C-alpha cells in the first residue's frame, strides 16, 4: 500500500526540482498521484474497503488544493505538471 523508498526516489527524481526535493508543489502532487493510483487499484479489488475509500478522497482533495495553488502562482508550471502526470485529459 505505502510507497517504497525506491518508488519515492523514482517519482521525486522525475518531478522534483532537484535531487532531494520533497517540498515543491510539483513533487508533492506527483507523490499524491502515485498514492492515488495505487489506492485506486486496491479499491478495484476490495470494493467494500470504505476506510481506504475515505483515505483516497482525502488524498484527491489534498492534490486538488495543491494543483489550485500551482495554477494560481504559475499557470505555465501548472499546465506542464498536469500534462506530464496525465491529469485532466
Curated annotation (Swiss-Prot):
A GO MF label: structural constituent of ribosome
Matching SUPFAM superfamilies: S15/NS1 RNA-binding domain
BP GO terms, sorted: translation
Keyword field contains Cytoplasm: no
Record flagged with keyword RNA-binding: yes
Compositional bias ranges of the Basic and acidic residues kind: 1-21
InterPro entries linked: Ribosomal_uS15, Ribosomal_uS15_bac-type, uS15_NS1_RNA-bd_sf
Superkingdom of origin organism: Bacteria
Gene3D superfamilies: 6.10.250.3130, S15/NS1, RNA-binding
Matching PROSITE patterns: RIBOSOMAL_S15
Region (Disordered): 1-24
Alphabetized UniProt keyword annotations: Ribonucleoprotein, Ribosomal protein, RNA-binding, rRNA-binding
Pfam families given in the database record: Ribosomal_S15 (PF00312)
Any single GO CC term annotated in Swiss-Prot or TrEMBL for this entry: cytosolic small ribosomal subunit
Family membership: Belongs to the universal ribosomal protein uS15 family.
Purpose of the protein: One of the primary rRNA binding proteins, it binds directly to 16S rRNA where it helps nucleate assembly of the platform of the 30S subunit by binding and bridging several RNA helices of the 16S rRNA.
PANTHER family xref list: RIBOSOMAL PROTEIN S15, BACTERIAL AND ORGANELLAR (PTHR23321), SMALL RIBOSOMAL SUBUNIT PROTEIN US15M (PTHR23321:SF26)
Subunit structure: Part of the 30S ribosomal subunit. Forms a bridge to the 50S subunit in the 70S ribosome, contacting the 23S rRNA.
Protein known as: Small ribosomal subunit protein uS15
Species this chain originates from: Rhodococcus opacus (strain B4)
